[in-house]
Amino acid sequence: MYSVEDPSVGSNSSASSLPFGELFQGMSFPGVGAQIMGADDKYLLQFDENVTKFWGSRHELALGYTFTPKGRVSPPMGEVNPQEFVNRVEEGFQVTPTWHQGCLRDNGKTDYAETVPIARWEYSTRPIYGWGDSGAEQKSTAGWLAALPVFEPHWQVCMAGGLSTGWIEWDGQRYEFEDAPSYSEKNWGGSFPLKWFWIQCNVFEGVSGEVALTAGGGRRGLPLVPGAYEEVAMVGIHYDGKFYEFVPWEGSVEWDISTWGSWKMSAKRDDYEVNLEATCDSPGCTLRAPTADLGLAPMCRDSFFGKLKLTIRNRSSGKMILDTTSDMCALEVGGGPWYNSWKTSARVQEPLKSLLRYSIDVERVFSPVPQLKPPGL
């Protein structure tokens, strides 16, 4: 899990010079962070306030950083071949949609979790699902407005499911794997929501083919209305090449999430309905998340040992499309306060609800003026 905050974003002068920059003014906590939650819920964090060695692609999911270069060699400022990375980087990482490589050393600043001193890895990834039907144009995760700097934060599932092959060295052990299930997403903006939950699973029992579930919800700020928030959630499932998306502007989405240990969601649209129930007996691991007033802070709790039951049903015929379970579900709660269970249904305010029902190709809109094209599009 990588995070970076540009020190210029908190500056009014620099922010206002960027397209849509006035939406991002506020406090600044510059730095680059890399976190790993590994086997046995152990943890590693490396963080550096110097962001000058960070590089990232403006319109692709490609990024990297050098915490410590080898000797006097200059750090890479873009993707390099694997051997060149080894020759030039002592501690750092590089990530693209198909390649992930790095070495991290824990900085010793975590007193609430059992940490691992060092981790190394190299693996390639073959994407299976993006966010949409296989072979079709892919979608924005939360509707076309999510492609613009409107909501806080902005969320895009880049690869709902993929297969990775390579190795990871963690806590003194080397793990080699072939076609291991993988997932990647990006978040951008100033901070995570005030409160949120997340469910993700790519490993299921009793079903043929690749299945990928991603669901989440949060209390997020409304654009250009300081102090106003809405509670929204969505469910997305890829199965047998088809994408089943459940969003509150096309139907109903409800959830009942406990402070820890139980995640329940149900959603309906005109043609399908989905139900999912997840539980977790393990205590999980506390991770850091971007916040508006504290920077990267320990604000969320995760586990990869969740038990999940997932069903999709055709509403008109009653036919069961998918009925499956898993004992390797990723579960998360974050932000707060979490005094008790969070039980509610999604409510998208107007005029956003009506706007999201339109199908707009944002990339095509910006093609005549590429200099205004938002990052990540």
Please provide the spans of the model-predicted regions.
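Structured soluble/peripheral alpha/beta segments that form catalytic or ligand/cofactor-binding pockets
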Residues: 1-377
